[in-house]
Amino acid sequence: MSEEKSRNGPARLKLVLGGATLGVVALATVAFGMKYTDQRPFCTSCHIMNPVGVTHKLSGHANISCNDCHAPHNLLAKLPFKAIAGARDVYMNTLGHPGDLILAGMETKEVVNANCKACHTMTNVEVASMEAKKYCTDCHRNVQHMRMKPISTREVADE
């Protein structure tokens, strides 16, 4: 019996080491994929997103990734959120009709608002309008992607 155990020892060790190596490679691949798909070059790889990428690059938020605003920061919330949003984007850009104007859905608005508040904590303390308006983007509609309208035609501060 001990002779049989000693023969199985190296095989078991190889199996454990192989499994651990495979696990590390899988985690590294997921981490790289998550980081890569957070960045502007990936997000603007569909032609419909090119104008958004240009305005982001020129904005005050150019140094942060798209998903610093557009996805939850919590990894367990981020994974399904990105998977669903990615599948929807692939479908709309290949089989659907995305239209000229891209509007955020309610779930995305909630995520973006939470991320605004997370980064701009000191601003939230001083802003009285936080009680009057539900979302930061109710007043700061185009802060990330720059002003789109001449001053004379704006309805909110940063259109």
Curated annotation (Swiss-Prot):
Membrane topology summary: Single-pass type II membrane protein
Residues under site feature: Interaction with NrfA: 40, 57, 63
Keyword terms, alphabetized: Cell inner membrane, Cell membrane, Electron transport, Heme, Iron, Membrane, Metal-binding, Signal-anchor, Stress response, Transmembrane, Transmembrane helix, Transport
Localization terms from the record: Cell inner membrane
Record GO biological process: anaerobic respiration; denitrification pathway
CC cofactor note: Binds 4 heme groups per subunit.
Cofactor(s) annotated in UniProt: heme
Residue sites binding heme 3 per the record: 61, 116, 119-120
Residue ranges that the UniProt entry lists as topological domain Cytoplasmic: 2-14
Stretches of the chain found on the membrane's Periplasmic side: 34-159
Binding residues annotated for a menaquinol, in chain numbering: 67, 82, 89
Inducing stimuli: Expression is induced by NrfR in response to nitrite stress. Not induced by nitrate or nitric oxide (NO) stress.
InterPro entries membership: Cytochrome_c-type_ET (IPR051174), Multihaem_cyt_sf (IPR036280), NapC/NirT/NrfH (IPR024717), NapC/NirT_cyt_c_N (IPR005126), NapC/NirT_cytc_sf (IPR038266)
Transmembrane segments annotated in the record for this chain: 15-33
SUPFAM superfamilies: Multiheme cytochromes
GO molecular function, one term: metal ion binding
Sites where the protein binds heme 2: 66, 69-70, 145
Residues reported to bind heme 4: 136, 139-140
Sites where the protein binds heme 1: 43, 46, 49, 89
Region of interest (Interaction with NrfA), residue spans: 99-100, 123-158
Predominant place of localization: membrane
One family name in Pfam for this protein: Cytochrom_NNT
Assembly mode: Component of the NrfHA cytochrome c nitrite reductase complex composed of 4 NrfA catalytic subunits and 2 NrfH quinone-binding subunits. Interacts with NrfA homodimer.
Function: Electron donor subunit of the cytochrome c nitrite reductase holocomplex NrfHA. Acquires electrons from the menaquinone pool and mediates their transfer to the catalytic subunit NrfA in an anaerobic respiratory process of nitrite. The other biological function of the NrfHA holocomplex is to detoxify nitrite. This function is essential for the survival of this organism as it enables it to overcome inhibition by nitrite, which is produced by other organisms living in the same environment.
Family that this chain belongs to: Belongs to the NapC/NirT/NrfH family.
The name this protein goes by in its record: Cytochrome c nitrite reductase subunit NrfH
